[in-house]
């Protein structure tokens, strides 16, 4: 019985609203108040296991659940639902050669239900607003490796790399705008059933696209060498590099909001007093622009 809802978990459309495409559209004017109530609760858990494979090696696995509360969107009267995530990890932490080398590796899988995303849209009164909505199901899976080498007491080399496949499994949202949004997104665009291009109701299907702000490849490389001076003070020379592959910056999947791959180089030179009471640093960020 869906008498009190639209059969998707949203409340029934109130007086003044129009049911279009399984959602409730309400075109409001300035000063119009839309009131309602919302509540949600969850019980989360964390479970894990560790196994010492040797004096300097450990294997571990865990499963963790998380919850982000829902609420009321600015763009329409439909509440956005809570976001639930379940994260699975399995990994290993190791030290070799008298702790000269540290090597950690991890595999991970994160499953999202009703993932919350933020996007810019027009409200029913035609005003530009930032709105939260549910993107449906999504997952992120991948692997990370961290390596630290200390060949001497004055030298430290670190490297970390992560590979992530993160995508929307089910991501269909509705937007209210004037004109066909096909040119502004790489997603599949269709008029909403019951609406028309004239009133600007559209469904946008971004299923299968990469999650925003999640590059496939990312990592860092750094080195530190400490020069010990005759008066007991020290100088640290520390170059580093970070990189990331291309990624979308917003859930709208807009080409002009796609960040290109980059590599960022930095370096610093730090003088420290013999008692480490104070220091002076010179640094360069984004070498090579």
PLM feature spans:
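Transmembrane beta-strands of outer-membrane beta-barrel pores
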Residues: 1, 63-69, 96, 107-113, ...
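Gram-negative outer-membrane beta-barrel transporters
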Residues: 109-111, 133-251
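Membrane-embedded beta-barrel scaffold of Gram-negative outer-membrane proteins
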Residues: 52-66, 82-172
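Solvent-exposed loop segments that connect transmembrane elements
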Residues: 1-38, 72-76, 114-133, 169-207, ...
